[in-house]
Amino acid sequence: MLRDFLFLYPIMQLKILKWLLQFFRSVNRKSKFISDKLKKEIYFYELEERDSDIYIVTFPKSGTTWMQLIVYHLLTDGNMDFKHIYDVSPWLSNQAFRGASPEAVNKLPSPRFFKSHDKYEQFNRGFNNKVIYVYREGKDVAASYFHHNKNY
């Protein structure tokens, strides 16, 4: 019943999440994991989704950045007017953990496209946005993860 109430009134859900974040920050340092999760949830609730949004959702080390560049080239006819791909295609979870405001992302021109390693269901809130899911063989992901962590 509470879940139905929160679903119907998202502004209440946002206020509850902000209160919980403040509560867990004041308890102790061991609650950092919980406060980080809440910070991310608040960021996603404050993000204004559009019908033209494109989400590139993958498991880590599965070619996410390559897919970002491919989508950018298709949308801009090969224009390379950016310093880093995150300038034109932000990584939403990374932005949330850094404490960045979603205002900059909300000001990006349509169609916007985002990188994420989260579940794609988190972004689909009844809009007609698009999701690109990149699948890569599990053995290749494990090998790539191993070499990434070894050299990190």
For the regions a protein language model found, what residue spans apply to each?
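PAPS-dependent sulfotransferase catalytic domain
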Residues: 2-152
